[in-house]
Amino acid sequence: MTVWIVFEYADFINEIIGVYKEKEQAEKVHKEFPKWRYIEEHEVQ
């Protein structure tokens, strides 16, 4: 299964904003603050 994790840049450690099963949901959250957030795709078993 593929999941998308949205991170937000922080001072010392990047924070996880959320983990999503659908890419569209992750992109929606990312667009709220596109300069401060990024998405990573991960395969989980």
Describe the residue ranges of each PLM region.
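Short aromatic-glycine-(Arg/Gly/Cys) micro-motifs in beta-strand/loop hairpins
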Residues: M1-I16, Q25
